[in-house]
Amino acid sequence: RDWMDYANVKDNPTDVQQLHDALEAAVKRQLMSDVPYGVLLSGGLDSSITSAIAKKYAAKRIETNGKADAWWPQLHSFAIGLKDAPDLIAARKVADAIGTVHHEIHYTIQEGLDALRDVIYHIETYDVTTVRASTPMYLLARVIRSMGIKMVLSGEGADEVFGGYLYFHKAPNAQAFHEETLRKLSKLYLYDCLRANKSLCAWGVEGRVPFLDKEFLDVAMRLNPVAKMCPGTIIEKKILREAFSDSLPKEIAWRQKEQFSDGVGYGWIDTLKKITSESVTDKEMANAAKRFPINPP
């Protein structure tokens, strides 16, 4: 793609409206489905945007080319977390604002621990960062599938495209920023996308990611990298927030990023580390390669 070379994008203009329209078109394309669908709504910026756009199109009848309201089916949104987790509170606000039928799933730390063996089996890794994020999604997918929903939209990919991770604040210049987004995108299929796909597919649920839609990527990655940068105290993904600030509650549109596993509840990762350190001895780790000769921990 032409945008893989910084020289081809460094002088490009920045059109916020074009970005807005491109993402709406991407979500509309991803909604093409002959099975019941829903949206993953964590309460963060990315999933809130995809959910708001999905609701916009799901609320209209296709047969009338979007001119008449659709009375059925209603769009269902899903959020998971420990009780009183930050994500659950934020997701509730978004669902109320956009009008989805919202399902709030609570899980306990013990339920997460009980699912660990199955989660590791399905995601095929014991990397702690991947496991801690996969477990809530695995538990959520079970509930989604039990309701007969077979496809969900997710917000994966936005952080890689727009430099949403906090370390992007330290990018020394636009070229370094752009090249890091390219690096993150090139590795995405090995980590976040694979993790989400395996967690959902374990229960027969398909996940779709509008932020990684090919046509949308061409628009988003051709933006001048300077417009995506977040130096100093500027909040990450500012251009994306500006594009959809009218579609979301203000406190959501300008909410700072949290990791999914932190957003579902801070106690989850702390307990996971504690249980692991108590269950596995230093001697067992030293002999791990003998017991697990293929890809030892």
Predicted regions and their residues:
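Conserved S-adenosyl-L-methionine
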Residues: 249-259
